[in-house]
Amino acid sequence: MRAARRGLHCAGAERPRRRGRLWDSSGVPQRQKRPGPWRTQTQEQMSRDVCIHTWPCTYYLEPKRRWVTGQLSLTSLSLRFMTDSTGEILVSFPLSSIVEIKKEASHFIFSSITILEKGHAKHWFSSLRPSRNVVFSIIEHFWRELLLSQPGAVADASVPRTRGEELTGLMAGSQKRLEDTARVLHHQGQQLDSVMRGLDKMESDLEVADRLLTELESPAWWPFSSKLWKTPPETKPREDVSMTSCEPFGKEGILIKIPAVISHRTESHVKPGRLTVLVSGLEIHDSSSLLMHRFEREDVDDIKVHSPYEISIRQRFIGKPDMAYRLISAKMPEVIPILEVQFSKKMELLEDALVLRSARTSSPAEKSCSVWHAASGLMGRTLHREPPAGDQEGTALHLQTSLPALSEADTQELTQILRRMKGLALEAESELERQDEALDGVAAAVDRATLTIDKHNRRMKRLT
């Protein structure tokens, strides 16, 4: 009977120590019945995180020396294992407590992943699906990005943040998104300028064509005929204009680069790499900085957002398989707003990513206005917190029961961030107005060029 149970859990892949000892008839370890306070606190922290991925696997239960089937779940800050039979969380710990992640073999045969925590607690995971390499690459990526994040972020992950720090972090994130949007608008303005230069060049070419057609339409005995059509005087200016028009595209216009775990068509094979967002498209590189694929902006058919940390990019083809890549990254929340600006009509938020849409239901103007008023109100309450002379006791009681006010350092930092955001918003508004005028000019130039080309076509038909 015991051998049959072992065959059910990972086909006998247990640690080779004291196999003859039987376990409790209940089959539930004593540690599981009485979880410690650290375990409960970790579960509460993880409940606030977004689940990035879940894999079926088995976990080696050290007290009973047997393997338990369940689900391994990863969030941006935590890792946990839940059993299939009872739905109970056996293991739950933050990524910041991990010391080492290794690929090992259980019983020298079965491939496993071992995770070493602070305090020398070692966890064994085996029978990982779709494969051990996929699970290892994704967990290692998020662990590494957490360690490489801002200094002190890992050490202060478990320390509760004050209201001023939370508000400062919120405003800093809003400022970064506003900077990314302003950068996209700047490159978009460069593209409009390039289009306008191309239209000016086309208009000058049409003027040359008009003179050539006039030369051809004049009779042979006309004494004022010239030989403009035999010599191309516009060769040198054309070269200069073409070089000028291609100037913005030579810089490639890199918006953002992030590390990512990349899979091509299938999820069973992944590799670490990098996603680069350009003005003209998207580039995917491997860990050796070799270009795997480049999506031109007009070639991207759809971008599906599976979660705040996972997207898939697809380009459809007729008669051959589609070109599709799936990317998982800890920095993906920074890229999704930029992709929404560039590929607004091609983005699709799936069920697990609807939290992004709910977080951005209001318009940018409403959000900036609400954030501005909220921060101004908080800073106003911080700066003016002297009680009135007539009601000292009631005000003191109110201050004791209310939330702690902002510190002077937080107030100054918030003031600087708000000032920068206001300047960025004004610059973005002026850039949008300039681009609206440029679009009107482009539309007028296109209409003039269309009329001129139609007129030249009619004149050429009369000549033939």
From Swiss-Prot:
* Region: Disordered, residue numbers: 20-42
Q: Which PROSITE patterns match?
A: T_SNARE (PS50192)
Q: Name one GO biological process term.
A: synaptic vesicle fusion to presynaptic active zone membrane
Query: What is the first-listed, main subcellular location in coarse terms?
Result: membrane
UniProt cross-references to Pfam families, sorted A to Z: GRAM (PF02893)
Identify the domain of life: Eukaryota
Cell compartments where the protein resides: Endomembrane system; Cytoplasm, Perinuclear region
The chain positions of domain t-SNARE coiled-coil homology read: 154-216, 401-463
One of the record's GO molecular function terms: SNAP receptor activity
Q: Could you name the Gene Ontology cellular component terms for this entry?
A: endomembrane system; perinuclear region of cytoplasm; plasma membrane; presynapse; SNARE complex
Protein keywords: Coiled coil, Cytoplasm, Membrane, Repeat
Known partners and oligomeric status: Forms a complex containing SNAP47, VAMP2 and STX1A. Associates with the BLOC-1 complex. Interacts with BLOC1S6.
Summarizing the function annotation, the protein's role is:
Plays a role in intracellular membrane fusion.
Family stated for the protein in its record: Belongs to the SVAP1 family.
Instruction: Kindly provide the name given to this protein in its UniProt entry.
Output: Synaptosomal-associated protein 47
Q: Which species does the entry assign this protein to?
A: Homo sapiens (Human)
User: Highest lineage ranks of the organism?
Assistant: Eukaryota, Metazoa, Chordata, Craniata, Vertebrata
